[in-house]
């Protein structure tokens, strides 16, 4: 039976790539895609979720959730890598939708509508929606199956500040609330996702433009390559969110350790930093599994094969 998942995304080019794979994966039933502000503002993120789904036209359309601003506003965005529209300045046309419920309501409704503890939340952006859902439904932790989160670092540097990773930095208070929740959680940090760089050679292995998936990715990815070259001087792009999806679909390719993690919310230089008690005799209680390594070659192959499978399953 297919695994029920909710994709919580801030598209974002790598979010869009993850959606391409997940929406056509026969092992997944994507019951909802919920938007959150991060790489772009909440309104644009909501539009982009709808854009990706319209462009791909998967066999089963999931419920959509609309993003709203975090309580303290977004401190940063990802326009330097993803463009003003979050999808590489592609400006796809999109139909106007009415009555899209807030993301946190959609999350709670889908989890409550399913059999107990069978839905996995794949959180690929800031954790704003997940924290709000836990306020909206205080017992959510007991009925969600698992939360798999892309974010944070264990021992490496951040990517938006010297100490903080982008998703956690965008809404550290929300991340702190989710880290402290009683839910079953797995964190996929930068230490691991930075191991893979999607190169031009891999780009050339994508499906061609006769498929919707190939046409979409070949339009949105080139601006990301330019952004990474201009910002970082590298010939390739990181696909943090797609790797996180692989941790759900191919867990055998990843190594995890149980850890005790917290989020710094008030440091002058360290706001958004993820802190783990890794002392020989820790005093914090373990609260999540953290991915510490992966078979990078096999994960890369799984990403490419997942995209080709998506193109082959277009109706």
Regions found by a protein language model. Give the residues of each.
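Histidine-centered active-site/metal-ligand motif
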Residues: 82-84, 129, 240
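Short, surface-exposed amphipathic charged segments that create phosphate/polyanion-binding patches used
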Residues: 77-85, 161-165, 203-204, 278
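Metal-dependent C-N hydrolase catalytic cores
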Residues: 3, 46-114, 286-299, 304, ...
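Acidic/polar N-terminal loop/beta-strand segments that form early-domain functional surfaces
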Residues: 35-38, 67-69, 266
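Conformational coupling and interaction surfaces
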Residues: 2, 21-24, 29-30, 169-173, ...
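Short, mixed-charge aromatic SLiMs
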Residues: 40-44, 73, 153-157, 262-279
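Active-site histidine-anchored catalytic micro-motif
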Residues: 2-9, 13-51, 93-195, 200
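A residue-level signal for conserved active-site and pocket-lining positions in enzyme catalytic cores
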Residues: 64, 178, 245
